[in-house]
Amino acid sequence: MTNMRKSHPLIKIINHSFIDLPAPSNISAWWNFGSLLGVCLALQIITGLFLAMHYTADTTTAFSSVTHICRDVNYGWLIRYAHANGASMFFIFLYFHIGRGIYYGSYTFMETWNIGVLLLFAVMATAFMGYVLPWGQMSFWGATVITNLLSAIPYIGPTLVEWIWGGFSVDKATLTRFFAFHFILPFIITAMVMIHLLFLHETGSNXPSGLNSDXDKIPFHPYYTIKDILGILFMALALLMLTLFSPDLLGDPDNYTPANPLNTPPHIKPEWYFLFAYAVLRSIPNKLGGVLALALSILILMLFPSLHLSKQRSMSFRPLSQCLLWILVANLIILTWIGGQPVEPPFITIGQLASISYFCIILILMPTMSLMENKLLKW
């Protein structure tokens, strides 16, 4: 009799995806982030669902409903902070996952990579809308500033902004629709993740060497399931430490003040995971130029397959490109720091230089370095 996991129509799909899946024998801990992102997504959906049971999407009661969750609901504080800090963990893992893809040349799987970039956009949109829901000062003003950027679009901009707002300012209609979108998007993201995996399993995983590993494959279970569980335990430890010891470490104190349209906070800034893009936006004095640079700072990921000029796939054996990539990482950390600083000297200049370097490293230096390495290796 055939094993049920190999014959049952539904279980067969799970078997081919997570149990009998042939995986390269040499994938390192950098390949753990995919499963960690999946766990993060599940955690966010579960905690979000419980929060939605007590939250009210109305400008008069939104702030107090969040307070009520933290004070009166059984373990409401834990659910709320696990959700907020879970989002931070999500982005940490996302950035590691993308960095791994760039380092090891995983972007040569075009379909998987492009779906991944679309996933990044969807997660960013979800996180932005979620930040608006507590209806604190930074929620309100963040929503006002970011949605206002669309008014830079020629001709249709101002109408588009009012259409998104559902009125002439960020108000009740905006909050209600943001809650609706924040609720539905994670399920759309889940569907996109399935497509992401579908395309990945068409080609099989990349390996640190960047070479074809068809000659040496091992079953995903038990080798990589146990490895993923270890990663999940580390993640659970980090998230619990953050949630139980310093839940507000990554938040903004301004968001503990109820939204007030008549009082602007001194420094409007998004959550830490958007600061690098926010710094790029602010570094350009022109509004439309800033919006385009903001979009391009993430859309540039789509260009990686076209900019790959090296004869080798991975950076494992390319020390010069490795140095450049780590310079890019340092540059992104500088951009993140600048995004959280006020718009005054010397931060303006540092932000402009870091933004120029960001685009130069990716568009000019990395392809040039690849060609140079080809020459050095006489290829």
Curated annotation (Swiss-Prot):
<feature type="binding site" description="axial binding residue">
    <location>
        <position position="196"/>
    </location>
    <ligand>
        <name>heme b b566</name>
    </ligand>
</feature>
<comment type="function">
    <text>Component of the ubiquinol-cytochrome c reductase complex (complex III or cytochrome b-c1 complex) that is part of the mitochondrial respiratory chain. The b-c1 complex mediates electron transfer from ubiquinol to cytochrome c. Contributes to the generation of a proton gradient across the mitochondrial membrane that is then used for ATP synthesis.</text>
</comment>
<keyword id="KW-0999">Mitochondrion inner membrane</keyword>
<dbReference type="InterPro" id="IPR005798">
    <property type="entry name" value="Cyt_b/b6_C"/>
</dbReference>
<keyword id="KW-0249">Electron transport</keyword>
<keyword id="KW-0812">Transmembrane</keyword>
<dbReference type="InterPro" id="IPR048260">
    <property type="entry name" value="Cytochrome_b_C_euk/bac"/>
</dbReference>
<feature type="binding site" description="axial binding residue">
    <location>
        <position position="97"/>
    </location>
    <ligand>
        <name>heme b b566</name>
    </ligand>
</feature>
<feature type="binding site">
    <location>
        <position position="201"/>
    </location>
    <ligand>
        <name>a ubiquinone</name>
    </ligand>
</feature>
<dbReference type="InterPro" id="IPR036150">
    <property type="entry name" value="Cyt_b/b6_C_sf"/>
</dbReference>
<dbReference type="GO" id="GO:0046872">
    <property type="term" value="F:metal ion binding"/>
</dbReference>
<feature type="transmembrane region" description="Helical">
    <location>
        <begin position="178"/>
        <end position="198"/>
    </location>
</feature>
<dbReference type="Pfam" id="PF00033">
    <property type="entry name" value="Cytochrome_B"/>
</dbReference>
<dbReference type="InterPro" id="IPR048259">
    <property type="entry name" value="Cytochrome_b_N_euk/bac"/>
</dbReference>
<protein>
    <recommendedName>
        <fullName>Cytochrome b</fullName>
    </recommendedName>
</protein>
<dbReference type="InterPro" id="IPR030689">
    <property type="entry name" value="Cytochrome_b"/>
</dbReference>
<dbReference type="GO" id="GO:0008121">
    <property type="term" value="F:ubiquinol-cytochrome-c reductase activity"/>
</dbReference>
<keyword id="KW-0479">Metal-binding</keyword>
<dbReference type="Pfam" id="PF00032">
    <property type="entry name" value="Cytochrom_B_C"/>
</dbReference>
<feature type="binding site" description="axial binding residue">
    <location>
        <position position="182"/>
    </location>
    <ligand>
        <name>heme b b562</name>
    </ligand>
</feature>
<feature type="transmembrane region" description="Helical">
    <location>
        <begin position="77"/>
        <end position="98"/>
    </location>
</feature>
<dbReference type="InterPro" id="IPR005797">
    <property type="entry name" value="Cyt_b/b6_N"/>
</dbReference>
<comment type="similarity">
    <text>Belongs to the cytochrome b family.</text>
</comment>
<comment type="subunit">
    <text>The cytochrome bc1 complex contains 11 subunits: 3 respiratory subunits (MT-CYB, CYC1 and UQCRFS1), 2 core proteins (UQCRC1 and UQCRC2) and 6 low-molecular weight proteins (UQCRH/QCR6, UQCRB/QCR7, UQCRQ/QCR8, UQCR10/QCR9, UQCR11/QCR10 and a cleavage product of UQCRFS1). This cytochrome bc1 complex then forms a dimer.</text>
</comment>
<feature type="transmembrane region" description="Helical">
    <location>
        <begin position="288"/>
        <end position="308"/>
    </location>
</feature>
<feature type="transmembrane region" description="Helical">
    <location>
        <begin position="113"/>
        <end position="133"/>
    </location>
</feature>
<keyword id="KW-0349">Heme</keyword>
<feature type="transmembrane region" description="Helical">
    <location>
        <begin position="226"/>
        <end position="246"/>
    </location>
</feature>
<feature type="transmembrane region" description="Helical">
    <location>
        <begin position="320"/>
        <end position="340"/>
    </location>
</feature>
<keyword id="KW-0813">Transport</keyword>
<dbReference type="InterPro" id="IPR027387">
    <property type="entry name" value="Cytb/b6-like_sf"/>
</dbReference>
<keyword id="KW-0472">Membrane</keyword>
<dbReference type="GO" id="GO:0006122">
    <property type="term" value="P:mitochondrial electron transport, ubiquinol to cytochrome c"/>
</dbReference>
<dbReference type="GO" id="GO:0005743">
    <property type="term" value="C:mitochondrial inner membrane"/>
</dbReference>
<feature type="transmembrane region" description="Helical">
    <location>
        <begin position="33"/>
        <end position="53"/>
    </location>
</feature>
<keyword id="KW-0496">Mitochondrion</keyword>
<keyword id="KW-0830">Ubiquinone</keyword>
<feature type="binding site" description="axial binding residue">
    <location>
        <position position="83"/>
    </location>
    <ligand>
        <name>heme b b562</name>
    </ligand>
</feature>
<dbReference type="InterPro" id="IPR016174">
    <property type="entry name" value="Di-haem_cyt_TM"/>
</dbReference>
<keyword id="KW-0408">Iron</keyword>
<feature type="transmembrane region" description="Helical">
    <location>
        <begin position="347"/>
        <end position="367"/>
    </location>
</feature>
<keyword id="KW-1133">Transmembrane helix</keyword>
